[in-house]
Curated annotation (Swiss-Prot):
FPG-type ZnF: 237-271
GO biological process, one term: base-excision repair
Record text on cofactor binding: Binds 1 zinc ion per subunit.
Superkingdom in the source lineage: Bacteria
Protein known as: Formamidopyrimidine-DNA glycosylase
Species: Saccharophagus degradans (strain 2-40 / ATCC 43961 / DSM 17024)
Subunit structure of this chain's protein: Monomer.
Cofactors named for this entry: Zn(2+)
Amino acid sequence: MPELPEVETTRRGILPHLEGKRVKAVSVRNRSLRWPIPADLAQQIQNKTLRTIHRRGKYLLLEFANGHVIWHLGMSGSLRIIKADEPPMVHDHVDIAFGGNLALRYTDPRRFGAVLWTNEAILEHKLLNHLGPEPLTDAFNSAYLFDKSRKRSQSVKTWIMDSKVVVGVGNIYANEALFNSAIHPLKAAGKLSQKQCDIFCSEIKSVLAKAIEQGGTTLRDFVGGDGKPGYFAQELNVYGRGGKACKKCRKPLTEKKLGQRTTVYCTHCQK
C-alpha cells in the first residue's frame, strides 16, 4: 500500500508538470473504486485551472477555484504523468488531460483507491477532519507523543499507526522506526518513557524523510509520478526480512501478525 512517502513522492513528481495548467478533458473508464467516482467530476473541473496539489496524510488534494479533488491511492494505485494520447491499459481508470499534451493517469489494479470531489472547506471534509498531526511538522514532537500515549494499553505499533494519533506512519515505516528506536512493537504505548518518545519521534521523522528522498518504497505496484519505482526498499532493516539475520546482532528476526499487519522485529535488540 502506498504510504506517506509514496504519496508525497507522487505529489512532488506531478506538481511541477500540472500546477497552473487548465483541464482540457476528463476520462473516467471505471467509476467503481472504493467509493464511486462522482458522475459530475468532469463537469466540476473541466476548463478549470489546477492551482496546486496538497497532501494530508495519505490523501492528495488537487485544488481548484471551486473545490478540491480528493485522491487516495488505495492498496495498489499510482498517479503518473503521460502524453495525453497514450493508449490506456486495463487498470488505467482515470485520465485528466491538461494543455501541452500532458495527462494525469490513475492506475489501480485492485480498485481500493478513491477519487472524490468536494466544494466544502477541505479540512472539514469527513475523511480529513479527524486526522492527527503531520509527522514531519513541529506539531508532531516528543512531548506530544509522550502525552498522547499515557494510559494507552494497546501495542505501540498499532497505536502509532492510528491516523488519529499521527497521520502517515504506515506498516513499513512503523516497523522501521520501532527497530531504529530499539522499541519492541508489542510494548504497551502507555509504557513508553519520555526518553523513548524522544528517540521514537526522531526516528519516525528520519525514516519518513529518508524514504521521501529515495522516492518511497516499491514492493509491488507503486511508481512515482515519473513512472519510476521507489528505492527505499534497499534501506529496509526489518520489513520484509522475517527470519533473516538482524543487521545489528545477527540473530533471526521474528515475524508475526499484529492487528492483521505483518510485524517484523528483533527480540534481542528491541525491548
